[in-house]
Design a protein with these regions (language model features):
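Conserved structural scaffold segments of CAZyme catalytic domains across common CAZy folds
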Residues: 1-60, 331-332
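Conserved, mostly hydrophobic/aromatic
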Residues: 22, 102, 129, 213, ...
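Aromatic- and carboxylate-enriched substrate-binding clefts and catalytic-loop regions
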Residues: 33-203
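Solvent-exposed beta-strand/loop surfaces of large extracellular or lumenal domains
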Residues: 102, 300-320
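Catalytic cores of secreted or luminal carbohydrate-active enzymes
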Residues: 205-251
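Carbohydrate-binding surface patches
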Residues: 255-292, 333-336
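Solvent-exposed beta-hairpin/edge-strand motifs
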Residues: 289-305
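C-terminal beta-strand-rich structural cap/linker in extracellular carbohydrate-active enzymes
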Residues: 315-338
Length: 338
């Protein structure tokens, strides 16, 4: 909600639209973002949770860690053991399945201990956890597999904060797979096909490819419901069925900041994402030999005639030969091989 509506979670009807979007897109979860404790215009948080569950959408809820910036609430719900158990008990009883906890100021030992306390208690109440505005991944998922993802990245929310990401996003996005995302799940919130407070100049093909290139066990889609609803049918179907946990990953080509083609496998299906990080037209060339897909077919979603459109090709018969994909400046593509 935050990416499109700064204070949207104060508005019951706005958040309800995102739950309806999750139903339409067959996404199993929906996040109720910051300031839900001030919700009005048709209902409160209890009403929204009830509505979400009635539509078979599992709700997750945002919290301020209350350790640094005391801005959006709710505040001080999780800091003490007593308050945390009270809140987690309410969440579990209400049917909430996870928490997104935000605004951690530093890596001092007191905050590192706080992360572990949050995870330990969340496990007891069967709550998934997303740490936002947080430290980098540190392997905690090995001990706490309910830690689904962490931000620790200059992600898409910055289109709503400052203009700095607009000019740098393409190169930045092609650097992250070689750096930040190597060490753990990354809650970048990809897939911004329209504009927030500050515009993006990456293409729609680029934005779609981020959902494959960036790994996150919870992949948050940040754009407005009406934007996703207006996407071409085949693109919506792709986003509806996109996995978030993978069986294999292979780098097919790339160089940090310049370009990347990354393949991820779920079962027998390969998903390939390609990104152009430059301001020039570029052809991305790569071999399919590592994927062993000869005789299979491929659907491609790539840059159209301009940065706001897609070109979609279906049922391309494959060999193991080299592939060439043309990208617009700051462009990209997705391929699905079955």
């Amino acid at each position: 909600v935050y990416w499109a509506h700064n204070h949207g979670s104060k508005n019951f009807k706005i958040v309800k639209d995102y739950i309806d979007l999750a139903v339409d897109m067959k996404w199993p979860y929906s996040l109720i973002d910051a300031e839900w404790n001030e919700m009005s215009n048709g209902g409160d948080i209890e009403d929204l949770i009830t509505y979400s569950l009635s539509r078979n959408i599992k709700p997750m809820i945002w919290y301020n860690s209350s350790t640094a910036w005391m801005g959006p609430g709710p505040l001080y719900r999780l800091n003490s053991k007593e308050n945390r158990i009270k809140e987690y008990t309410w969440l579990q009883k209400s049917g909430v399945v996870g928490v997104k906890i935000d605004f951690f100021p530093d890596d001092y030992s007191s905050n590192m201990d706080y992360y572990i306390d949050l995870l330990e208690d969340a496990a007891k109440y069967k709550l998934m956890v997303n740490f936002h505005g947080a430290t980098i991944p540190r392997g905690w998922q090995r001990t706490y597999p309910h830690l689904m993802t962490m931000e620790a990245v200059y992600g898409a929310e910055w289109y709503n904060n400052k203009p700095i990401l607009t000019d740098r996003a393409a190169e930045h996005n092609v650097t992250l797979p070689f750096t930040r995302n190597v060490i753990g799940s990354m809650d970048y919130t990809p897939g911004t096909f329209s504009d927030s407070q500050h515009p993006h100049i990456t293409t729609c093909g680029h934005e779609l490819a981020l959902s494959v290139v960036f790994e996150s066990a919870l992949q948050h889609m940040p754009d407005r419901p009406e934007v996703y609803s207006s996407l071409p049918r085949k693109v919506r179907e792709f986003l509806s069925g996109l996995p978030t946990a993978w069986d294999d990953t292979k780098l097919l080509c790339g160089y940090p900041g310049a370009d990347i083609v990354l393949a991820r496998r779920k079962g027998d299906v390969w998903y390939i994402g390609g990104l152009n990080g430059t301001n020039e037209n570029k052809t991305l060339s790569f071999s399919l030999v590592p994927l062993q897909v000869e005789g299979k077919t491929m659907d491609v979603f790539k840059d159209g005639v301009d940065d706001k459109s897609f070109a979609i090709e279906e049922d391309i018969q494959l060999s193991n030969d080299k592939m060439d994909m043309s990208c617009l400046p700051r462009g990209g593509f997705v391929a699905v091989i079955k």
